Amino acid sequence: MNLGDTIVAIASAVVPNQGSIGIVRLSGAAALPIARQLFQDPGQQTWESHRILYGYVRHPQTQTIVDEALLLLMLAPRSFTAEDVVEFHCHGGIIPVQQVLQLCLGAGARLATPGEFTLRAFLNGRIDLTQAESVAELVGAKSPQSAQVALAGIQGKLAQPIQQLRGQCLDILAEVEARIDFEDDLPPLDEPQIQRDLTQVLEKVAQILQTSDRGELLRTGLKVAIVGRPNVGKSSLLNAWSRSDRAIVTDLPGTTRDVVESQLVVQGIPVQVLDTAGIRDTEDAVEKIGVARSLAASQQADLILFTIDAAVGWTAADQEIFQRIVATKANQPLILILNKIDIGQPEAIEIPPQVQGVVKTAAAQHQGVDELETAIANLVQAGKVGAADLDFAINQRQAAALAQAQQALIQVRETIAQGLPLDFWTIDLRSAIQALGEITGEGVTESVLDRIFSRFCIGK
């Protein structure tokens, strides 16, 4: 990859016969000369930065008009990449956009690799690595809340505390190295104060690390399994919740033989709902497989909706299934669903301590769905499941680097407590500083950059 090349790519989604506008983006030193070759400006408008020009895209040899278009000019350094950037806004659809792309390639541009526009923005110092990663997360956001967290990352709300922590570590290192280099000219280090400073940094590191799991939930979604014995209304609950007929519903126990999935958004949180086969002892070979998959789904879920028939109450079979689920995954959040309340109200039920919420539903009548969503949202907000309100969230790469910094800082404290020489302090302090720098992109290796930006789409 030659970063001195001028690159080009389609920057809009290409949907056959459906797109209204197609965008072809150029970035690099030759972006403006290439645009001048291809774009005819009938109004002789001034080619200044941050202006929109109206005209035609012409073939440079035949002068054939390829498309009527708008041209956006964003010259360095006031552009996304901090290079000269030009965008052709063409008519949508595959043919016009591909024709403009081919003309740009023929005029000397190179096809951009995935994420290369954002990579150039990073390498040119316009954004740091956390902001670059947040761009990809915003594009792939599955809910308004995950989009908001990604946008916070783009605005630097993650980079700021990381840079502050790195600065604090650099200050401590400077104090230590000054005592090494000028031992006779400076007073001894205030070791208790250094320990207090390290404790403060570690507390902030721990707070940021806590956002990792919740951020991952926003990115991938909350996995919710509807579990219970046969014919308690699990499939009816899925259909009512998803407002569709995803699952087959009959009065016959054992109708659902496999896990049925549906994708929903609950108060900004993406949710993958799993309707599982009714759990019971059976001789039916196919149903046995379904039961096994139900138990597996319950273990993988972030939250279980344990469903019983309210008209019948809590039965011995319900108790047996509940114990099997609790035994396989301790401390798993559960909501008890009392379904079929339109048929009969349950007698007093002793709620097991593992249950963290009770919701009454009449799934066949589409009743209780709003209450269920509120109960799930309350668990999330309380931090018992996944993602409470987040100002920002770190991803897995960032969490791994932050954990390295945390371990190095803990080692510094132990080194001080053991009374080891100051040279030993600096080793782990430098490790912590390096790990924190990797989060924002300082000193990050080329292989890490390749891995990060390969996940981007071409044109971003």
From Swiss-Prot:
Coiled coil: none
Binding-site positions, K(+): N231, T250, L252, T255
Matches recorded under CDD domains: trmE (cd04164), TrmE_N (cd14858)
Gene Ontology, cellular component aspect: cytosol
Residues that coordinate or bind (6S)-5-formyl-5,6,7,8-tetrahydrofolate: R25, E87, R126, K460
Database matches in Gene3D superfamilies: P-loop containing nucleotide triphosphate hydrolases, Probable tRNA modification gtpase trme, domain 1, tRNA modification GTPase MnmE domain 2
Signal sequence residues: none
Binding positions for Mg(2+) per the UniProt entry: S235, T256
Disulfide bonds: none
Compartments in which it is found: Cytoplasm
E.C. no: 3.6.-.-
Family annotation (Pfam families): MMR_HSR1, MnmE_helical, TrmE_N
Main localization (coarse): cytoplasm
The keyword Magnesium appears for this protein: yes
Gene Ontology biological-process annotations: tRNA methylation; tRNA wobble uridine modification
Domain of life: Bacteria
Top EC class for this record: hydrolase
GO molecular function: GTP binding; GTPase activity; metal ion binding
Name this polypeptide is given: tRNA modification GTPase MnmE
Organism: Picosynechococcus sp. (strain ATCC 27264 / PCC 7002 / PR-6) (Agmenellum quadruplicatum)
